[in-house]
Amino acid sequence: MTASETVAFVDKMKPNRFSVEEKFRWLTDIDGMIVRELIDTHEDSPLDAPFAGYIPGRDDDTELIAPAPYDSLYRWYLEAQIDLGNMEIAKYNNSKGLFNQAYLTYTDHYNRTHMPRQRGGFRFSERRKGGEHDALSSRT
């Protein structure tokens, strides 16, 4: 789903007073979170270039990072932001719960299909002095 398709769908499902620019900023926020929390921590990044966010007009036809069937997370994130901006806390809680579930489903899928990056390694070194660990032999 593209950024403009997502915004149009949310505007149809939940008419609101928020600008396209604000919604693109929210999409930038959620995809930025996906990049930081998932893509940057795993091998084989699906991105061709560093993530620079979305700008209306320039990125209308840009595909969002989470593919179908996981792209519902964008709808629920935008709806949650709209509800929060309108101070409709009960609706926000519902939308945020639906977003959290959709995001968790996507992260589970991503974690199953991509290897985590190996960051350094653990080296265990045991130096012995007289048959005891150094730490133990330094005690008197």
Which ranges hold each PLM region?
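Short helix-capping/linker segments at secondary-structure and domain boundaries
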Residues: 82-92
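Conserved short "hinge" loops at termini or chain/domain junctions
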Residues: 1-63, 101-140
